[in-house]
Amino acid sequence: MDNLANQGVIVLAAGGTGGHLFPAEALAHELRARGWDVHLATDARAQRFVGAFAQDHVHVIRSATIAGRNPVALLKTFWSLWQGNLDSRKLFRRLKPKLVVGFGGYPTLPPLYAASNMGIPTLIHEQNAVMGRANKGLAGRVKAIAGGFLPENSGAYAAKTVITGNPVRSPVLVAAATPYTPAGKDDRFRLLVFGGSQGAQFFSQAIPAAVALLPEHERARLLITQQARKEDEASARQAYEKLGVPADVAPFFNDMPARMADAHFVIARSGASTVSEITVIGRPAMLVPFPHALDHDQAANAAALAAAGGAEVVRQADLSPQRLAEMLQSAMNELERLEQQAKAAKSVGKPDAARLLADLAEAIASGKTVQEFKEGNRP
């Protein structure tokens, strides 16, 4: 990195999925602009998402997910977490960070536990409306909690919680400058479908099946961009080719914010990063929460946007191809409704979340309390 800081080192710890890493990337960008040297502690899954960090600033920490009750499996898990704790201590002794910030996921447990035990100030950011298990386990130990969709003034840790919103990456802020323009009745209708950074098998089956049920003149208007898991990519692409519908299908799009800005309608899961980007860019959406989420966090995230009038929320179990086709046809023809949804979504977006979170991070790094931060006593 060619503009290393004089403020000191801050380590960001995040699980290796886009939902955890994208807000970490956004905070890193803001902190670097303020003169901080920012490092990332993560797991091996993160390689395709960490382009915003120099290679020597990415540190893979051993970790494991706590799942099931098998004694042997649990023993292996706790052994991995202990090894991660040792990895983290060694890293922190070398880097001497002034703050460690966790973004959720089990890979954050070793760095945050190590930091708190070493007397290094700690902060966690919870993206969702319901606190995840890893953050829940850390909430009592850290100096401060930043919330994306957490309800304000609720829960046992309200006194040390600050609602900052979810930081979004620079390309999202660039895309947010593109105003929403409804498709004309005879125009191509650009549909964006994605299931978060890990894709969604359900969409790869359900969307082509629904498109097949549309009247031919409606099908002819569609231009589809769809994220699909690698194992579903070929079958989804073939389904659209058979229907004569132009479709760009891939496991991952590096330019997803630009594609969202270009879309007339979005069908997506409702992870926190997804919902945050939809609101900052301001696009009408149908949200289908992942039904197997242990904490039902996606349902809570979706409900927050639906309450503002910015999205329709449909349970996956209720979304037959027939119903999906009806909702898609309605979206293609109720252009005024989509325009109102886009405005409602944008009205609840927080494009300044990275700045607010960076303000909090600097305050905690300097030794200030959350109460002092809330009272305006900032660095």
Curated annotation (Swiss-Prot):
It is a peripheral membrane protein. It is found in: Cell inner membrane. GO terms for cellular component: plasma membrane. Its EC number is 2.4.1.227. Pathway: Cell wall biogenesis; peptidoglycan biosynthesis. Pfam families: Glyco_tran_28_C (PF04101), Glyco_transf_28 (PF03033). Keywords: Cell cycle, Cell division, Cell inner membrane, Cell membrane, Cell shape, Cell wall biogenesis/degradation, Glycosyltransferase, Membrane, Peptidoglycan synthesis, Transferase. UDP-N-acetyl-alpha-D-glucosamine binds at residues 17-19, 128, 169, 197, 298. NCBIfam families: murG. This is UDP-N-acetylglucosamine--N-acetylmuramyl-(pentapeptide) pyrophosphoryl-undecaprenol N-acetylglucosamine transferase. It comes from Brucella melitensis biotype 2 (strain ATCC 23457).
